[in-house]
């Protein structure tokens, strides 16, 4: 199992959502685990951006996640955070997917509050991290 370390300190408004997203992913996949700490592989930031929230990542644990204030008021914040974290773990967007699919993101609309990856998403992450 690979441990990927994240730094939540630059997103003080989203500490609970970040912790929840990490817990969701940690309970959903076995080949990679997330933990908060120093010398981090990736970091969370917060602020205002007309593009909304996004992940700038290599798709294998490195980079950063930006959490947009306005989008997180409109959409379920734990879902947004878990979705962006999914990018750091290697998953692409799939906006046309249903609410049950985490990587459908904002596609199903603000009424969708599901923060959990589905079976296909979980197995994809496990496969991507099978060899470290």
From Swiss-Prot:
Keyword presence, Secreted: yes
Names of the cofactor(s): Ca(2+); Zn(2+)
Top-level enzyme category: hydrolase
Binding sites annotated in the UniProt record for Zn(2+): 83, 87, 93
Disulfide bonds: 99-112
Compartments, record wording: Secreted
Protein name according to UniProt: Extracellular small neutral protease
